[in-house]
Design a protein with these regions (language model features):
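A short beta-strand-loop structural module common to alpha/beta enzyme folds
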Residues: 28-39
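C-terminal binding/interaction regions
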Residues: 4-6, 10-11, 89-145
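Mid-chain, well-packed structural core segment of small domains
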Residues: 63-64, 69-109
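Short, structured active-site "lid" loops
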Residues: 45-63
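Glycine-rich phosphate/diphosphate-binding loop of Rossmann-like nucleotide-binding domains
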Residues: 5-24
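Short active-site oxyanion
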Residues: 2-3, 58-61, 80-82
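Charged helix-capping and loop-helix junction motifs
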Residues: 43-47, 87-88
Length: 145
């Protein structure tokens, strides 16, 4: 699977860890930055990663900042993006199964590397259930106008 990654300075170390983890599992990664721990603005990198998913260049995206909140908000401003902030595997599974989320946000200050790996693995392997959830996702998409 081709996956976009984005982070700010607070998520840099975890992004680099997840990047290596994904590549070790055979995934192709598009790293949208940031590329250091120098202070930067999370909306830039949340949007950049989301645009890769929006365009179809990437199938899914993962964004990381200290809490995951700001960067998830940034990603969700991009039309067609459903980015869910997850801190444990069950939320990652359910957001794929019920919300057809195409992006995952995590907070580097909230979870460790092992938990992040578990969340990512579940997020990438869970499938959308469709059915009644298809209608609900359609209603979400309609809000975008």
């Amino acid at each position: 699977m081709k996956i976009s990654l984005g982070c700010d300075h607070g998520g840099y170390a975890l992004k680099e860890h997840i990047k290596a983890y994904l590549e070790s599992k055979g995934h192709e990664v598009v790293d949208c930055g940031t590329y250091s721990t120098d202070s930067c603005d999370y909306p830039i990198f949340g949007e950049a990663a989301a645009r890769k998913v929006q365009s179809g260049e990437c199938e899914r995206g993962i964004v990381i900042c200290t809490t995951g909140i700001g960067i998830s908000i940034a990603a969700n401003k991009v039309r067609g993006i459903r980015c869910a902030l997850c801190s444990e595997p069950l939320s990652a599974e359910m957001t794929r199964r019920h919300n057809n989320a195409n992006m995952l946000a995590m907070g580097a200050g909230m979870i460790g590397k092992n938990m992040a790996e578990r969340i990512v693995e579940v997020f990438l392997s869970a499938e959308f259930e469709g059915g009644r959830h298809e209608r609900r996702v359609g209603l979400l998409d309609a809000i975008e106008g």
